[in-house]
């Protein structure tokens, strides 16, 4: 279900973010074209992050990324975003179940993530998976228009 991101995925990645205004506004101030996403994907692939598409029957339905800290036995979820027409179909849960299995194989014992304090739907979803809030933080001027207020959450896998 999780497939690594590659350079040819720019068009679909762009469409996912255009469907999800909350994420789009964080990453961009104006309309971005596929060429901008091609540039971003190159940065993502060079970065320490690990990026996957969530695939169902050969169709990409979302994007899941995380940062790896194997020496500390930890991973931090970067982004989970599901394309609008595939919301509420269980794809986020399936992606996390596969992700947790990968963590166990890699001896990862703690998973962290951050979530917008106003995103009750996501907070409840993460709580159902077993995550707990352990801190709050403000990212000043996340983009030019607002500060990002978020909860830090964690899940112990052992």
Task: Describe the residue ranges of each PLM region.
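Active-site acidic-Proline motif in GNAT/NAT acetyltransferases
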Residues: 83-85, 89, 117-118
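C-terminal "cap" of GNAT-fold acetyltransferases
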Residues: 109-112, 116-120, 132, 139-158
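Short coil/turn segments at alpha/beta junctions that flank glycine-rich nucleotide-binding fingerprints
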Residues: 89, 106-109
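Acetyl-CoA-dependent GNAT
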Residues: 4-10, 15-85, 96-98, 102, ...
